[in-house]
């Protein structure tokens, strides 16, 4: 028997503001593709401006998935993302289309492409109940701080209010002596799909200028009013509000900083996030990078994907 043919998937990653959205839509048109968002915050409804969510006009008729699927009050896990995206990949492939994942949330994308297993084994029930009791008596932040001490990478990924996931990560460390984040990394070796993994990069100063400009444009587009709407709905201490662009403006509404300080902090946090994204992708994934400092490289990238996945684009003769 021959080897089972793996589904073909194109993936576009890179830091915020580098130009992933436009490229992905151009590629989808050329390659008969449909787009799956690989951004952990674009899943939230009514959080459009601060997440730089793709607009209906930008979509230009290309179907997009994993956008606007949760309310801001709801939590969302890597495991749920993995399950949903793999289902979309199957369905898009069955329709004879090419799944194109685009985004900057590295661990989420990695969990889909590689043979990650998210288990809820029995673990240590006594320890779990003890931590649940601590969360009730001392608060969720106390338990989250304990996770920060032993597994900072998981603590950054899991919001304090997602108590079940926080305690699960602590339980894994308690019972195995290993961090949850390390356990996930050990599972990275096997790709489940025939993948073309493209990364966009550019000169750092140019990228930072683009990020600063994007924040100014977001403010002009109504980011303040968007965040005020969430604030007035009483949305507090949710996973969604930890997103860059929201937590900074929340500080303004809670009189911790001036609006000018909030916007300045938003720019700083966005630049730092872009730097972390690039570092993460370079350390964790085998990416073919395209430098777009001097302009877009759509044709070059299209040819690369055609060759890697043995496809013919609508532009090919």
From Swiss-Prot:
Its EC number is 2.5.1.75. Its cofactor is Mg(2+). It catalyses: adenosine(37) in tRNA + dimethylallyl diphosphate = N(6)-dimethylallyladenosine(37) in tRNA + diphosphate. Pfam families: IPPT (PF01715). The keyword tRNA processing applies. It is an enzyme of class 2 (transferase). The record marks 105, 128 as: Interaction with substrate tRNA. Keywords: ATP-binding, Magnesium, Nucleotide-binding, Transferase, tRNA processing. ATP binds at residues 14-21. GO terms for molecular function: ATP binding; tRNA dimethylallyltransferase activity. Substrate binds at residues 16-21. Residues 39-42 are annotated as: Interaction with substrate tRNA. The keyword tRNA processing applies. GO terms for biological process: tRNA modification. It comes from the Bacteria. Belongs to the IPP transferase family. Catalyzes the transfer of a dimethylallyl group onto the adenine at position 37 in tRNAs that read codons beginning with uridine, leading to the formation of N6-(dimethylallyl)adenosine (i(6)A). Monomer. This is tRNA dimethylallyltransferase. The gene is miaA.
